[in-house]
């Protein structure tokens, strides 16, 4: 069976944006104009097709990436919806991994928001080419050129407008296309799908010429050939301009900018034309890196030939079909009814039904080809980030990095009967979301759930109730503290026990040294002359790692330490792995007590946008929460305060901020780094932990 859309004509794109920049509306309009959905869904009434989980409808924010297939001018566009809320950056990371290009949506009034910076950084990390759509041009305060400046100054990118707006706010009529030098005007609001090409209005001619010159300059820098032509005073042809824009976009040296208002249906068709013209096909982006089990690196090219290789990037539980695993195929093809090999887990998987999703309608298909995205029903062992491959070529594609959770709460089912239902629900949710963890507190026996922020955990508890009908009582949020050491020490420890018959003997000298924040744990074997036999060294490492689980101050995990074993002794008969493990573990604990152990806490980067009248109150409150104000800025008449605050002091912040500013301030918060806890606070924590 051959593919219906050639690889060259496939586009895998994501729509990335800050909350309320109009991302879901833009996705909806794309589906509308590509003819897939007949009635446009509005986020305001909670009816958008892309937002298909209950909580999103209520909160009006997009949480899970649904992958949707649509068609525009004989191209297949696979649209991956990315969430804009900061607690869901893991979802964004995950979708960035499988995108080839992105449309970054900015609000013409709000411009570059803190979350836009996070998403932009992630797109840079994965080298995703993008085009910018400045949305909401009909709103009061709309300013296309401000957004252009912010992209240049705050995101350090090189924005190149391919359009400039005709009017703004209530007078927004359309755009001037700088490539063709025509005005595209939407004359009749009742027929949003129709626009007319006209001559450029006289009052905008000069501005259009100025911006076209800037565009041509940027385009000419994408190749020596175009540069020569441009410097020689020759006109660039339409074809050359388009080729230059695409080359600049793919090399990330320019970011093409367009504008419109998705809500009023203006500017969406030209945006789709730009997606097709300037964003890459799967075979135009860098090959994806992979490796074999023995560590040999290999590069996997997007092509129909060759053995199958794909990445599972999302797991969802669908009420009708059960578990869906979303897969991006990089090479070869995946057929329903066949087998694939999970090379990450070393297990064979049977491929049941294959579905292409249209936000929440499904189409059953027989084959997924290279470059395509679809969902597989019924995989048993495959989790997010696993590679599926052919048994003949067991490649493992790049692994994804998932952050460690920073906040935990204890949950208990309201009735004992729900205990098992709750465990099943939490395990399913943990399979879908690698940044969410479930564990059991060994002392209290309580179930602990951990995630990336308060909202993240609220939504998990909410989903338990809605999807699994489990009502849960939620405890007080707990912060994920850590411990570390501040000075280097050397520690000897001898573990010797004689209890009739064979004894136990392990003897080590350890050097403990603090490392830079974020370095984790490093183990060095510096044993000379076999004073501790080689086979016992892994046991020493293991003993230290076990001791790291419970720090000496308050039992929190220890990080950022380097431990060197440099001397010791052993006994021919009595030494064992167990003895060395215990010697290392106890030796580390004794050493840590002398090494200036301190407690670390997660610091959040908090950005508050507030009207000036409330600025004093907001800053005063952040100081009370042990926050350090880092910078102050202005945006759209409001003050922007950036601060680093301990997570422990930020619980319930949204309610407090609302009451301080009569609901007029907004904030965003994301984990930034770990920092030492002040002595008085540390004493409190230790007292509480050690009872």
Swiss-Prot record:
SUPFAM superfamilies the record matches: EF-G C-terminal domain-like, P-loop containing nucleoside triphosphate hydrolases, Ribosomal protein S5 domain 2-like, Translation proteins
GO BP, one annotated term: ribosome disassembly
Function comment: Catalyzes the GTP-dependent ribosomal translocation step during translation elongation. During this step, the ribosome changes from the pre-translocational (PRE) to the post-translocational (POST) state as the newly formed A-site-bound peptidyl-tRNA and P-site-bound deacylated tRNA move to the P and E sites, respectively. Catalyzes the coordinated movement of the two tRNA molecules, the mRNA and conformational changes in the ribosome.
Entry annotated with the keyword Metal-binding: no
Similarity field: Belongs to the TRAFAC class translation factor GTPase superfamily. Classic translation factor GTPase family. EF-G/EF-2 subfamily.
Keywords of the record: Cytoplasm, Elongation factor, GTP-binding, Nucleotide-binding, Protein biosynthesis
Subcellular location: Cytoplasm
GO molecular function terms listed in the Swiss-Prot or TrEMBL record: GTP binding; GTPase activity; translation elongation factor activity
An example Gene Ontology CC term for this record: cytoplasm
Pfam families attached to this UniProt entry: EF-G_D2 (PF22042), EFG_C (PF00679), EFG_III (PF14492), EFG_IV (PF03764), GTP_EFTU (PF00009)
Gene, per the UniProt record: fusA
PROSITE patterns on file: G_TR_1, G_TR_2
Chain sites annotated for binding GTP: 17-24, 81-85, 135-138
Residue ranges of every copy of the tr-type G domain listed in the record: 8-283
Domain of life: Bacteria
InterPro entries xref list: EF-G-like_DII, EFG_II, EFG_III, EFG_III/V, EFG_IV, EFG_V, EFG_V-like, G_TR_CS
Coiled coil start-end: none
Name recorded for this polypeptide: Elongation factor G
């Amino acid at each position: 069976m051959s593919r219906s859309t050639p690889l060259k004509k496939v586009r895998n794109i994501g729509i990335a944006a800050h909350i309320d920049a109009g991302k879901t509306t833009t996705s909806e309009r794309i589906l509308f104009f590509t003819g897939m959905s007949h009635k446009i869904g509005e986020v305001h009434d909670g009816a958008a097709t892309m937002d298909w989980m209950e909580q999103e409808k209520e909160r009006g924010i997009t949480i899970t990436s649904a992958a949707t297939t649509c068609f525009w001018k004989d191209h297949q566009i696979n649209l991956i919806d990315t969430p804009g809320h900061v607690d869901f950056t893991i979802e964004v990371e995950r979708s960035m991994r499988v995108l080839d290009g992105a449309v970054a949506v900015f609000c013409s009034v709000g411009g570059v928001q803190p979350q836009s910076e996070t998403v932009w950084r992630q797109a840079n990390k994965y080298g995703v080419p993008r085009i910018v759509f400045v949305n909401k041009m009909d709103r009061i305060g709309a300013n296309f050129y401000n957004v252009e400046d912010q992209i240049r100054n705050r995101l350090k990118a090189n924005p190149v407008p391919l359009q400039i707006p005709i009017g703004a706010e209530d007078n927004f009529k359309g755009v001037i296309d700088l490539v063709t030098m025509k005005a595209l005007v939407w004359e009749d609001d009742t027929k949003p799908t129709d626009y007319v090409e006209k001559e450029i209005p006289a009052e905008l001619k000069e501005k259009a010429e100025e911006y076209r010159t800037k565009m041509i300059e940027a385009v000419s820098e994408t190749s020596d050939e175009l540069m020569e032509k441009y410097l020689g005073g020759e006109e660039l042809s339409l074809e050359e301009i388009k080729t230059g824009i695409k080359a600049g976009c793919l090399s990330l040296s320019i970011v093409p900018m367009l504008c419109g208002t998705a809500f009023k249906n203006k500017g969406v068709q030209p945006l789709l034309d730009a997606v097709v013209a300037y964003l890459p096909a799967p075979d135009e982006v860098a090959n994806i890196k992979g490796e074999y089990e023995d560590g040999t690196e290999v590069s996997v090219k997007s092509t129909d030939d060759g053995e199958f290789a794909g990445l599972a990037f999302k797991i969802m539980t669908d009420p009708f079909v059960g578990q869906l695993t979303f897969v991006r195929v990089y090479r070869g093809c995946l057929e329903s009814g066949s087998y694939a090999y999970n090379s990450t887990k070393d297990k064979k998987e049977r491929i049941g039904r294959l579905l292409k999703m249209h936000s929440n309608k499904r189409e059953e298909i027989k084959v997924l080809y290279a470059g395509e995205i679809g969902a597989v029903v019924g995989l048993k062992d495959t989790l997010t980030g696993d590679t599926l491959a052919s048994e003949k070529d067991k490649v493992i594609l790049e692994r994804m990095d998932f952050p460690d959770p920073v906040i935990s709460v204890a949950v208990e089912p309201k009735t004992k009967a729900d205990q098992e239902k709750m465990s099943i629900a939490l395990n399913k949710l943990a399979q879908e979301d690698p940044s969410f963890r479930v564990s059991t507190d060994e002392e209290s026996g309580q179930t602990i759930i951990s995630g990336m922020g308060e909202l993240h955990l609220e939504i998990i508890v909410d989903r338990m109730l809605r999807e699994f009908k489990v009502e849960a009582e939620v405890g007080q949020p707990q912060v994920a503290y850590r411990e570390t050491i501040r000075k280097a020490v050397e520690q000897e420890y001898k573990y010797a026990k004689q209890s009739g018959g064979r004894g136990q003997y392990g003897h080590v000298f350890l050097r403990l040294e603090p490392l830079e924040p974020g370095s984790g744990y490093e183990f060095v074997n510096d044993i000379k002359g076999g004073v501790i036999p080689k086979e016992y060294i892994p046991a020493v490492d293991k003993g230290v790692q076990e001791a790291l689980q419970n720090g000496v101050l308050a039992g929190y995990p220890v990080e950022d330490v380097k431990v060197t074993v440099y001397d010791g002794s052993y006994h021919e008969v009595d030494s064992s792995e167990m003895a060395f493990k215990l010697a290392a573990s106890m030796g580390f604990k004794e050493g840590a007590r002398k090494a200036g152990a301190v407690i670390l806490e997660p610091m959040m980067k908090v950005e508050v946008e507030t009207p000036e009248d409330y600025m004093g109150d907001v800053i005063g409150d952040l100081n009370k929460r042990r926050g350090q104000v880092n910078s102050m800025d202005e945006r759209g008449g409001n003050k922007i305060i950036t601060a680093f605050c301990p997570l422990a002091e930020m619980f319930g912040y949204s309610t407090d901020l609302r009451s301080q500013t009569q609901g007029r301030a907004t904030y965003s918060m994301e984990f930034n780094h770990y920092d030492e806890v002040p002595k008085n606070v540390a004493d409190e924590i230790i007292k509480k932990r050690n009872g």
